[in-house]
């Protein structure tokens, strides 16, 4: 028996499937709903609270390079499987599946172009590819970015966005820490500036190698920066951690980060620093 019967037809609302996917983004900090166009206008930051969304290397390239004009290089490098590593699946299958699902080919992209009318080489990491982890290809790309900067007599900017070394490559991954750090000495010898921008997150072997070696170490606001994560540290020392521990602002207070820069001001900051350090 039906107790209630709808006499009049309900008001028809727009079906959810009529709304294009990705049109609205939710801020992970304050929960605000942001239209895609507004998000683009604010370089993928929340206009309410300033939260910085993770973005791809290509979006950083668009923000930085004059007229969105740049030349990508060494984009054909692909990860191998030197150890035949398998956890829940084969490493080679994991790489293949990630490429197929994301359209990304590795956790780092290199490009060069003009920023403020002067040449700049940028190596940007991508958390969307296996957590932005550094394997042999990422280490090689960053090393080649150093070589390109020397070739062009230009500064180098490395944008870190990574969970650390890629465990599936074992020692091949760990040696990239030494390899990239050693390669950066070429810039010192040529008196070329190296800028390191740490974004959320910059962890593990990335922090323990090139990310902290910049002539100027910059960070986006509230980026998580450290070696082991705060939960691991807290469980190990059995003590509560200071408020904001391992966040950019905390590291800035301790002198590990030279400057916290909003993404809107990133290009102008790089232009200013490059001008100051130009020889």
From Swiss-Prot:
Its cofactor is Zn(2+). Pathway: Lipid metabolism; malonyl-CoA biosynthesis; malonyl-CoA from acetyl-CoA: step 1/1. GO terms for cellular component: acetyl-CoA carboxylase complex. Residues 23-279 form the CoA carboxyltransferase N-terminal domain. Its EC number is 2.1.3.15. It is an enzyme of class 2 (transferase). Keywords: ATP-binding, Cytoplasm, Fatty acid biosynthesis, Fatty acid metabolism, Lipid biosynthesis, Lipid metabolism, Metal-binding, Nucleotide-binding, Transferase, Zinc, Zinc-finger. The keyword Cytoplasm applies. Binds 1 zinc ion per subunit. It catalyses: N(6)-carboxybiotinyl-L-lysyl-[protein] + acetyl-CoA = N(6)-biotinyl-L-lysyl-[protein] + malonyl-CoA. The keyword Metal-binding applies. Zn(2+) binds at residues 27, 30, 46, 49. GO terms for molecular function: acetyl-CoA carboxylase activity; ATP binding; carboxyl- or carbamoyltransferase activity; zinc ion binding. It holds the Pfam family Zn_ribbon_ACC. It is found in: Cytoplasm. GO terms for biological process: fatty acid biosynthetic process; malonyl-CoA biosynthetic process. Its main location: cytoplasm. A zinc finger (C4-type) spans 27-49. PANTHER family: ACETYL-COENZYME A CARBOXYLASE CARBOXYL TRANSFERASE SUBUNIT BETA, CHLOROPLASTIC. Component of the acetyl coenzyme A carboxylase (ACC) complex. Biotin carboxylase (BC) catalyzes the carboxylation of biotin on its carrier protein (BCCP) and then the CO(2) group is transferred by the transcarboxylase to acetyl-CoA to form malonyl-CoA. Belongs to the AccD/PCCB family. Acetyl-CoA carboxylase is a heterohexamer composed of biotin carboxyl carrier protein (AccB), biotin carboxylase (AccC) and two subunits each of ACCase subunit alpha (AccA) and ACCase subunit beta (AccD). This is Acetyl-coenzyme A carboxylase carboxyl transferase subunit beta.
